[in-house]
Amino acid sequence: MDSLDLLRTAAGGMDAQRAALDVLARNVAASQAAGPKGSYERLIPQFAIGGDGESQVVFAGAVAQKDDGGGILAEMVSVLNASRAYEANASVFEIGKHLAERTIDMGRL
């Protein structure tokens, strides 16, 4: 895997986690709007392996699930997990960018 593949993979992971965060934000809003006795259909982000033969994670949509009683706490835990995964992909992207820059610098010597 060269540094450009690393950048593509990390960017794909960031795109997937951003889409998951959008779904989770809708869940938080829906759980607050449902009221104490109303239930809402929670959307669960789904991921798949994508790309052209390379290992790349893509957002594959969301599947509806009846509220299991976890409510806002479960949603916030999911938001934290998705946020941390996004940050991890952003860190990998920065490392890949640094490696690409160093490779270009070495080629100039």
Task: Locate predicted features.
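Amphipathic alpha-helical polymerization modules
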Residues: 1-109
